[in-house]
Amino acid sequence: LTFDTFLGPSGDKVTVNDKTTTSDVSIESELQKIEEKAAAMQEDLSSGELAQQEMNTLSLQLYQLWDNELNSIWSRLKETLDEDTMTTLTQEERDWIKTKDSAVEEAGKDAEGGSLQPLLENDKAAELARNRVYELAEYLK
């Protein structure tokens, strides 16, 4: 695995999975590592110690963690699935993106224009991306 490292809101180093570069890592162990990173980020979000802007930034990083994993899995699916399956899956993915975008927008409506809006939207995006990661990972098992 390759990782991007950057400083999180509290100054701690945060490492985000960028893409998988070795095929000997099982999808289960790969997802376990992502879950561990996500849990640490979620713990920081729930700590009550971060300012709103820090929470917004960290929630975006949590979404990016899952979105990067989703993109990594998608790249591998393009290499391994037959053309018909990939065509069907591509249409499903387009539909999923529309649904996700609507759900994310809806999640932020109650706080529209406020400092809480990004947190609500990022949390929903992370939740949906995580769920989609697990759906797509089934094709790699």
Protein language model features and the residues they cover:
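N-terminal alpha-helical modules
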Residues: 2-141
